[in-house]
Amino acid sequence: MPLTTITTPPTFVSPVSQACTQAQFDTPEFQFWCREVREPFRYHRKLWEYCFLLQVLSSEGMMAPGRKGVGFGVGRETSVAVLAARGVQVTATDLDMDSAQQEWVLTGQHAGSLADLNERWICPPDTFSQLVNFRVQDMNAISPDLTGYDFAWSLCAFEHLGNIEKGLAFVKNSLNCIKPGGLLVHTTELNCFSNDETLDNGPIVIFRRKDFEKLAAELVAEGHEDTLNFTLGDDDLDRYVDVAPYTDRRHLRLSLAGQVTTSFGLVVRKALA
């Protein structure tokens, strides 16, 4: 099966592996998921990641009673509660408190308990407690018993695993968690302009187009499906590069260590056999 790359602007209605762009925010589907996660609408790439995940899972039939999903590095994601409210059984994983980045804990990005994952009361508490369980998990060493799920996901987590190679290895290893025909949805950082110089190791890395192309080629060679779209938008906010201290309203691209990055979502369908 050849590797498929789309060159037209990415759509939010039928997402593939693609970058965050302004046009995707300006759709009824995006605004629907904003309401579902109880976030005010704004042009922010982190909000795009939440909505991208939910749109992919919804469009692929994964948000239904009886489905099972596992999330990595979930922090305090409201997506867990949205899934549970629709009858999905969820295993939410994160680092233990001692291993978690201190900054994550201090900025409220780390879940200390199940209650943190339903703090907005998106899902009835009784339903949430029945469908959601939490466990400690190192993304660099996925437990072999995390198997049999319909889908697996992470939101801007695997760029924090130490280097580019470890991040890409996590994506491939997470395939072991899902059933044949299952779905992976992972978001991370994309270098907007450089396919060579980048942040390739340390607390955060920025993946390049060639990194995702290499990953996709390996996955497709194994029979999996991964359609790529690296087309970046050309609207006003697509051209705007936020600089530190970052804003909360115009934050699709940002300057980080001399590079310009945005969010990129990976969507991989596991081979049937």
Model-derived features: positions:
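Class I SAM-dependent methyltransferase Rossmann-like catalytic core
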Residues: 4-64
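A short acidic, Gly/Pro-enriched loop at the edge of an enzyme's catalytic core
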Residues: 137-152
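A short, conserved alpha-helix within the catalytic core of class I
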Residues: 160-174
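Conserved beta-strand signature within the Rossmann-like core of class I S-adenosyl-L-methionine
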Residues: 181-189
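Conserved class I S-adenosyl-L-methionine
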Residues: 62-75, 82, 91
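Conserved Class I S-adenosyl-L-methionine
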Residues: 195-231
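Short catalytic micro-motifs in class I SAM-dependent methyltransferases
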Residues: 153-160, 189
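Core SAM-dependent methyltransferase catalytic element
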Residues: 222, 236-273
